């Protein structure tokens, strides 16, 4: 790909990245960052696999942000990787989602390095945002 195209795409997705980062999510952009984070993972971590698709913009990101900020119980850490943009980081994070098909957008709640709750695209696309938020907050209540 051309450098101009890559720069265009970086600028295009910047607001999509910032929506989660500004809400306190730590963005992991390289496989090394994912490895370093996961090596020390203790407690609970809520992971959002971000995406450029419409259901990420209209449902996944807003539901994740509102669930984290509005829940009485919540994870110890919130992180995000960006599918289709930070491919190596996303692939490395998905290695921890053993038994789950790659899906973007998607969300996972981990205890240590083990997935205890997973929300694939199929449980995001076509749903009401309140349903997605409830799915997330129910997982927080059960596991955090």
Swiss-Prot record:
Lineage, top-rank taxon, reads Bacteria
Checking InterPro entries in the record gives:
BrxB/BrxA
Q: Which GO terms describe its biological process?
A: cell redox homeostasis
A matching Pfam family: Disulph_isomer
Family the entry assigns = Belongs to the bacilliredoxin family.
Q: Identify this protein by name.
A: Bacilliredoxin BLi02323/BL05224
From what organism does this protein derive? Bacillus licheniformis (strain ATCC 14580 / DSM 13 / JCM 2505 / CCUG 7422 / NBRC 12200 / NCIMB 9375 / NCTC 10341 / NRRL NRS-1264 / Gibson 46)
